[in-house]
Amino acid sequence: MEMETTEPEPDCVVQPPSPPDDFSCQMRLSEKITPLKTCFKKKDQKRLGTGTLRSLRPILNTLLESGSLDGVFRSRNQSTDENSLHEPMMKKAMEINSSCPPAENNMSVLIPDRTNVGDQIPEAHPSTEAPERVVPIQDHSFPSETLSGTVADSTPAHFQTDLLHPVSSDVPTSPDCLDKVIDYVPGIFQENSFTIQYILDTSDKLSTELFQDKSEEASLDLVFELVNQLQYHTHQENGIEICMDFLQGTCIYGRDCLKHHTVLPYHWQIKRTTTQKWQSVFNDSQEHLERFYCNPENDRMRMKYGGQEFWADLNAMNVYETTEFDQLRRLSTPPSSNVNSIYHTVWKFFCRDHFGWREYPESVIRLIEEANSRGLKEVRFMMWNNHYILHNSFFRREIKRRPLFRSCFILLPYLQTLGGVPTQAPPPLEATSSSQIICPDGVTSANFYPETWVYMHPSQDFIQVPVSAEDKSYRIIYNLFHKTVPEFKYRILQILRVQNQFLWEKYKRKKEYMNRKMFGRDRIINERHLFHGTSQDVVDGICKHNFDPRVCGKHATMFGQGSYFAKKASYSHNFSKKSSKGVHFMFLAKVLTGRYTMGSHGMRRPPPVNPGSVTSDLYDSCVDNFFEPQIFVIFNDDQSYPYFVIQYEEVSNTVSI
C-alpha cells in the first residue's frame, strides 16, 4: 500500500534538521478531523484553532496513555546522535491482511467521546509483589493488592508517560497533566502560551519498524495517519458489518474502509423521518440498549429524546408514537458460533414454551421452524445426549433470535480502538470459575489486616470503600455474580469493600483455630466466598455487627436456624429486596464452612460429629445437599465476615437516545 504524500510548494526547501521555530505546519482540515497531512515550511507557522485542538486532544491523549506513540517524542535537550533519527527502531509488518478495500463512500465521522466509554478503561499499575499461583478448589479468593487499591502483578507495566521528557522544567509533565502534554508537539499544538519542543525518540528498541528511515516530518505525518486510521465512522447503507480489523487495531484503510468503524462490536442507530439519515444513539446508551435487547423477554423499549417519549419495537425495529424517528437498527460484526469469540457476534436462539423463553441450539430451532411451517404436532430431537419431544398440538411455537450480551467492562480490555485501548489482558473467564482460587504469596500484610485496606480512624467501627473496576477483585466478583445472574437483566452499580477491624480479628482467630484441626484439602476449602441477599435497611447493621444467627427465620429456616449463604448469586437474589430507588443489595462474604452435614428445620446448632461422646466436636455448618452443597448455614457469628457489598439494579426499559 502506497502512502499518500503532500507535494511541497515551490518555495519550500528541504533543510537538514534544525530548531522547529524555522518551520511551519500546514494541514488539511475538515469539519470533523479528516485525514491530516503535514507540510513543513519556513517562517510563518500555522497554528491549529482552539476547536480543532479540543477535538484532537482526546485522540492524542488516548494514544499517549495507551502507548501507541511509544518512543515517538523525546526532548531536544537530551544528548543524542543526529543520525539516530534515521536508525531502525521498530519492526512492524505493514502488509496487514484486510478485507476492507479503499473506496469513496458516504459516511459520517464519529468523534470519540472518552467521557462516555474511554473513562471505563482500566490502567495498568506497576508492582514488585510475588506472582500468583492457582490452586484448583471449589471456591474463590481474591488477590493481594497494594494500599492504593491496585493489584499486584508480576508482569512489568509499560508507561507512555515515561517516554515524554520536557525541555523546560516549568512545563507541567506529570501524569496528571496529560491533557497539557499533547499541546506541546512542535508546530502543531500550542495553547495557553505554553510551547515545548520534542524530537523523535529512536533509542528504544520496539517491536516494529513504523518509523524506520523516516525524518521527523515524515514520522509526524505517520502519527497523523495513525490518528486518521483510528477515527470512527458509519455508513448510511444497510447490510454493512462492523470492521473487525478496526476493533483489533489492524485496519489500515481508516476512513476509506467500506465497513463501519465503531467503539464496540455492536452499535445502535435511529433514523430520522425527515432526512431519512441514520444517527447514532448516545455512547452512554449503547450498552443500555444492547443489554435490554439481548433479553428475549423484551419486545419493546421506551425511548426519550428532546423531552418526548416514544416506543421502539425490538422485533420489527420500528419506532412509533413519534414523528421524529421511524426506524431502529443494530450494526454488528460477522456472526460466529464460538461463544468465546470477543469480536464476533454470537447469536442465541430461543423458543417459547409454557415456562417462558428457553434457549436451544440453532439446529433444533430449524427443526421447530420446519415443524411449524408443515403443521406437525410434535418435534423429536436429541440434545445433550437426551431425547426430547416438543408438542405443537395447541399452539404455534414462537421463535426468537438475540445476540449474546457482552458488557463494556468485559470488552474494553480486548479492543484496540480509541474507546477501548487495552492495558493488560484480563485472565480468561474460566480462571475465575468456581473450581479455582487465586492464592497470592502472602495473603495478608504484616499488620494482620488485608493489604487493600485503607486508613480508618480508630473511632470508626467500620467503613465501606468503593472497589475500583481496575482491581482484580472487581473482575472476580463481577464474573462470579453474573455467572448465575444474567447481565441483560441486572447491572452492577457499585462494589464496596467492608473494613471492620474488630470483626476481622474475630474471624481470623476463628479461622486459625479451625485450621489447626484440619489438614490438606480440608484446610483449603474451609474458607469459601458465598452470597447473602438482604435489604438496604440492614446493610450497615451487618457491616458493624456481622451476620447474626439469632435473628434467623426472616426468610427461611429449612436447613437450620442460622445465617444462610449460597454459592449462587441467583439464589441470594430471591432474598434481596430492592430499595425505594430500585437498588438491590447483596453481600459476598467470607464463610468458614469447615466440616458440614445435612441440616434440618429444627436445628439451633450443628449436630455432634460423634453423637456417643459428650465432648465430641460439633459440625461447623449445615448444608442442603451433602454431596453437592449449594446452601450453607452457620450458627456462630465469628465464622463469617461481610467482605463485599454488591449494589445492583434491574435493567430499565427506558433509554435516552
Swiss-Prot record:
Auto-mono-ADP-ribosylated. A zinc finger (C3H1-type) spans 237-264. This is Protein mono-ADP-ribosyltransferase TIPARP. It catalyses: L-aspartyl-[protein] + NAD(+) = 4-O-(ADP-D-ribosyl)-L-aspartyl-[protein] + nicotinamide; L-glutamyl-[protein] + NAD(+) = 5-O-(ADP-D-ribosyl)-L-glutamyl-[protein] + nicotinamide; L-cysteinyl-[protein] + NAD(+) = S-(ADP-D-ribosyl)-L-cysteinyl-[protein] + nicotinamide + H(+). One of its GO terms (biological process) is smooth muscle tissue development. ADP-ribosyltransferase that mediates mono-ADP-ribosylation of glutamate, aspartate and cysteine residues on target proteins. Acts as a negative regulator of AHR by mediating mono-ADP-ribosylation of AHR, leading to inhibit transcription activator activity of AHR. Residues 332-410 form the WWE domain. GO terms for molecular function: cis-regulatory region sequence-specific DNA binding; NAD+ poly-ADP-ribosyltransferase activity; NAD+-protein mono-ADP-ribosyltransferase activity; NAD+-protein-aspartate ADP-ribosyltransferase activity; NAD+-protein-cysteine ADP-ribosyltransferase activity; NAD+-protein-glutamate ADP-ribosyltransferase activity; nucleotidyltransferase activity; zinc ion binding. Gene3D superfamilies: 3.90.228.10. Residues 449-657 form the PARP catalytic domain. The lineage of its organism: Eukaryota, Metazoa, Chordata, Craniata, Vertebrata. The modification ADP-ribosylcysteine is found at C39. The gene is TIPARP. It is found in: Nucleus. Residues 1-21 are annotated as: Disordered. It comes from Homo sapiens. Coiled coil: none annotated. Changing H532A: Abolishes ADP-ribosyltransferase activity. Pfam families: PARP. InterPro entries: ARTD-AVP, Poly(ADP-ribose)pol_cat_dom, WWE_dom, WWE_dom_sf, Znf_CCCH. Residues 1-10 have a biased composition (Acidic residues). One of its GO terms (cellular component) is nucleus.
